[in-house]
């Protein structure tokens, strides 16, 4: 922009790491930009410069493999390798490695250089967490994964910072409540922006079929539940194309049997 730009942010900042990632990437290409205070971002007049740029793999997408490792770990089968991820990633959802560490998943990086893309190994260890408490204000896209995984591992939880989940691709709070109930878990959203599970169960559907609400993350967060519910059906599986179009193919490579409707 010839005259630059000043942005004034209002209200509570949600998903702050995405703003920080954008600023860092702009600076990589020569932008003169400053986050001056909590609510003001200044972009000065400055053309972008051209140079090569490595695009790291998606830590958000890796969350579903962490979930698989955690659920398979109870069968001593949880060993997964992911490629082209950085230990020092600027992606906010790279926090998934810390979240799942309390669920018994050890993350090992093949390279000791924090800014070097490398192979990541996930190894399941014993989990003795009595209750999972976490504020998702900076990583709301990971909430569905942790809700499903925590329930299936029988770990009560209290998750906060979820106020934006109601205005995502769908109302993810209502969607989670409805679909987890099909699997026999009763969630509590009586406090706005929070979701709890205190261990309350109900009778699961005999042959559960998960609705995805045109939401890619509903499909991918619930897919690993087939480890506990063999034959689990996922309706409208094509929704994964928004962020992870090869998700089902990658599950096949990992040994999961995927049967499409046309094959019934």
Range-by-range predicted roles:
Residues 1-264:
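Short, structured segments at the rim of ligand-binding sites
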């Amino acid at each position: 922009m010839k005259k630059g730009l000043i942005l004034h942010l209002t209200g509570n900042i949600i998903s702050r790491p995405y703003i920080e990632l954008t600023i860092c990437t702009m600076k990589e290409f020569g932008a003169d930009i400053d986050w001056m205070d909590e609510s003001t971002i200044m972009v000065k007049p400055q053309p972008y410069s051209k140079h090569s740029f490595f695009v790291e793999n998606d830590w958000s997408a890796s969350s579903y493999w962490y979930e698989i490792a955690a659920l398979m770990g109870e069968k001593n089968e949880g060993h997964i390798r992911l490629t082209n991820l950085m230990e020092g990633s600027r992606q906010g959802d790279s926090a998934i490695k810390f979240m799942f560490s309390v669920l018994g998943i050890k993350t090992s990086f093949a390279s000791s250089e924090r800014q070097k893309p490398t192979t990541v190994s996930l190894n399941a260890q014993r989990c003795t967490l009595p209750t999972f408490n976490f504020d998702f204000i900076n990583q709301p896209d990971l909430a569905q994964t942790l809700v499903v995984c925590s329930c299936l591992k029988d770990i009560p939880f209290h998750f906060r910072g979820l106020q934006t989940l109601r205005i995502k691709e769908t109302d993810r709070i209502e969607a989670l409540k409805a679909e987890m109930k099909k699997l026999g878990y009763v969630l509590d959203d009586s406090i706005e922006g929070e979701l709890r599970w205190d261990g309350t169960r109900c009778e699961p559907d005999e042959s559960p079929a998960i609705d995805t609400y045109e939401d890619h993350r509903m499909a991918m967060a619930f897919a690993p539940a087939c480890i506990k519910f063999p034959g689990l059906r996922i309706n409208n599986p094509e929704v994964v194309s928004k962020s992870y179009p090869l998700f089902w193919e990658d599950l096949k490579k990992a040994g999961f049997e995927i049967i499409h409707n046309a094959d019934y």
